[in-house]
């Protein structure tokens, strides 16, 4: 087909701004501990909803008229998927529990302050969470049935995020930091003994982190023998592993870009295989992210095939070995994916794939030298239209990301 000549900027397109702006925003995805339910969070027109999908049945709405939304800092950390139901933070400042089966969501905390990053203890009798009230952040714990007032587990730092409880319920790890640092500047990773009967912690140990060393996402192995996390003590990141019995710390992966900036609560980049022999991690290269796995027995690193998607986020692995994550590319709108034995299934979409790919530009990773000799990286989006062409170079529109940690990705 012969293309029609028309100057750049005048090519008609079937893609309208309304089509691009009208999609659903996918926020997070998690497996229930037994792998029987896949739960995700999505937002549309200012309303966030939780959906759950059983293995062989259709997805259903969990949150109804409630509006799940983390209330600490800039948000995030909306929910935690348990075996029997979901614990979520509501915009009114309370934590709620909603069973997967029949029954209404019920509040489990009083309505004051804000909650985020709820974590059910393994017996599912208690919830650990981050709470803020009158500019004071703490780690707290509350019975799942709401029968008692929340108790403070840890206070004293200015900020807290990413609490994690060991599979036996006897240990807790978290990240904390103080003004004027941001979480990508410098944080501290702590490990402590957890007493669920008294709702208290003891034997607090500093594992990693400093004023200039940020830490990200402590996560216990399913067998409870190890704790993994991301650290940045230098130019690039490290994936570290603590053997809880011996106290030995080893570096599994280093000199890669692994740690996303913790702009909000609830961001994840790590996951464990159900046999505790593989650690899954995200790697950022040239504006694209990929899912990798590190085999602890062979030390081999394997790339999980998520083709054709170029930005993957929020990885999680079920007790049955199924991977779920959020994925998108420049020509594929965001969606929730389930990966089972190499087979990829779309569980939810931000919008349908009705947009013709030929009208969507495919970015190319490029770099150039600035006037002061610094290598600058970018994504070049060439004009894309199967029906039109133009003479000469197109006009250049330069979009520079904001802030010290923001980045432009090869994404929709």
Positions of PLM-derived features:
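Short loop/turn segments that connect beta-strands within beta-propeller blades
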Residues: 54-56, 99-103, 143-147, 195-197, ...
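Residue-level detector of Asp-centered blade-edge/turn motifs that repeat once per structural unit
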Residues: 33-34, 81-83, 122-123, 167-168, ...
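Serine-hydrolase catalytic core recognition
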Residues: 219-221, 312-322, 326-412
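Beta-strand-rich domains and repeat architectures in extracellular enzymes and scaffolds
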Residues: 10-51, 71-80
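A short beta-strand motif characteristic of beta-propeller blades
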Residues: 14-20, 60-69, 104-110, 149-154, ...
């Amino acid at each position: 087909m012969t293309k029609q000549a028309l100057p750049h900027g005048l090519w008609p397109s079937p893609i309208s701004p309304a089509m691009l702006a009208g999609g659903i925003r996918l926020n997070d995805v998690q497996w229930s501990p037994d792998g029987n339910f896949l739960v995700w969070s999505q937002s549309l027109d200012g309303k966030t909803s939780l959906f759950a999908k059983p293995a062989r049945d259709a997805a259903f709405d969990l949150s109804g008229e409630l509006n799940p939304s983390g209330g600490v800092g800039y948000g995030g950390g909306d929910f935690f998927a348990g075996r029997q139901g979901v614990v979520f933070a509501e915009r009114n400042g309370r934590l709620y529990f909603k069973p997967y089966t029949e029954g209404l969501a019920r509040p489990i905390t009083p309505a004051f302050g804000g909650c985020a990053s709820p974590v059910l203890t393994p017996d599912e009798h208690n919830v650990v969470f981050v709470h803020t009230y009158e500019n004071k952040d703490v780690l707290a714990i509350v019975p799942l049935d709401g029968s008692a007032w929340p108790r403070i587990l840890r206070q004293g730092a200015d900020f807290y995020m990413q609490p994690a409880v060991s599979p036996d319920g006897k240990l807790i790890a978290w990240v904390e930091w103080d003004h004027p640092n941001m979480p990508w500047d410098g944080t501290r990773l702590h490990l402590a003994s957890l007493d669920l009967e008294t709702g208290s912690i003891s034997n607090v140990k500093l594992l990693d982190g400093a004023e200039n060393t940020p830490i990200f996402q402590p996560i216990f192995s399913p067998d409870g023998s190890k704790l993994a996390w991301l650290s940045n003590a230098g130019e690039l990141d490290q994936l570290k592993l603590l053997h809880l019995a011996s106290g030995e710390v080893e570096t599994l992966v280093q000199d890669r870009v692994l740690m996303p900036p913790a702009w909000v609560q609830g961001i994840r980049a790590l996951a464990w295989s159900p046999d505790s022999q593989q650690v899954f991690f995200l790697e950022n290269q040239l504006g694209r992210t990929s899912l990798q796995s590190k085999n602890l027995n062979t030390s081999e690193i394997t790339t999980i095939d998520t083709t054709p998607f170029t930005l993957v986020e929020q990885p999680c692995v079920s007790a049955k070995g199924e991977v779920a994550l959020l994925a998108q590319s420049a020509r594929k709108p965001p969606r929730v994916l389930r990966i089972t034995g190499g087979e990829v299934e779309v569980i939810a979409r931000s919008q349908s794939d009705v947009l013709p790919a030929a009208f969507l530009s495919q970015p190319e990773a490029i770099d150039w030298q600035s006037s002061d000799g610094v290598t600058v990286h970018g994504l070049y989006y060439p004009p894309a239209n199967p029906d039109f062409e133009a003479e000469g170079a197109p006009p250049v529109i330069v979009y520079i990301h904001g802030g010290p940690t923001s980045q432009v990705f090869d994404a929709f």
